[in-house]
Amino acid sequence: MKAINIPYVTERWPGGMLTNFPTIRKAVKKMSAIDKMGTDGTFETLSKRERLQIARQRAKLEKNLGSIADLTRLPAAMFIVDVHKEYIAVREANRLNIPVFAMVDTNSDPRDIDFPIPANDDASKSISLIIDFVTEAIAEGLNERKMEKEKDAAE
């Protein structure tokens, strides 16, 4: 997902990430404010203890929200690997009518998923294979969209 510059979550799903999106955006803005402090030199004016606390806070925010820092609006669709483990993400997406594409194993209920992909969501090779196909399809779709925009601009 990094290759096509799409937001993703690899750690535990932060509850309310979609349904409480403004609060999550505030946390992301706080993370970028801490980054700005490091670049403009105000970080150096703080005491050693304050710098340590802010560095720890930054690391925690990066771990939980780093990959979604560029997410400025709710996603148009979601891809979930382990529906059984990430049931909160599925519930939030369903509540907001966001289509869900997901790998569904035998221990999961596919009724909540809009586009289930029957696959083993525990084996790393299976996950890697499906994610590679999905990433390739997304990249192809983005390229087609880009070509259409260029074609429309040329006309």
Predicted feature descriptions by range:
Residues 1-64, 68, 72-75, 86, ...:
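Acidic-enriched and Gly/Ser
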